[in-house]
């Protein structure tokens, strides 16, 4: 299977006003003029051939089929297949990273660029809802609860399709279902995202696919679902994963060259501003540790209790009252 290489520049979006008219224009813009795949959103042909090939000489092989095709399950399944297409996965990935002015900013995305992802913005939410929440609703309507089942429907073509799918399940719900609606993130989409994240890690995608491993703003999203889990064993995996990413960043602060174009470029970017790169890696590790300690202590995130209808324990109430982490919730 060949992946088309379409070259296009990545435009940084302008911030819209709060009016619905402007929001509508922005949604229309994203529908009509989203940039196509740039050099870091398309797998080089030779690399993809190595991934998909069954040759034993390949150092990394992407498993295209996890379980047999289960076929259509009525209108809901047909609707899902209509919504969850390769084109939509490409559009989501382009939208998610379009604010980065240079491809090199994907390797190390500074805090000024990460705000788009982690600071609540109604205009950003509106686009997520208009463009991508129909896919989420189509998934919900099928009642799919297995990550492997969903993967058998999607059939990711490359590691970048996996990236888009994880962002779709782990991040878009957080932009689409806020406030009292947030429970669906925690009870439905998060478990799917965790399963697919763990499957990706088991296949070695974030650790071995160069366009993920050495492009750290890509790699980070593979591990985010683990951070959101309330399962301590999943956090153990998250700690290991973020530490591996940090070690890779540190390995680039010295030496020259690399085994592929992605590693070579990543080394150039890191060595151009090593403190910035180190901060990105260390911050990810520390942020996961802040999440894990809460799960280790309470077995769950206290700040989710209200929206999930869980009774607040006294020690949890004390924790929140004293300024315990809620991570923006």
Language-model region placement:
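Intrinsically disordered, low-complexity activation-like regions
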Residues: 52-329
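N-terminal mitochondrial targeting presequence
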Residues: 1-68, 75
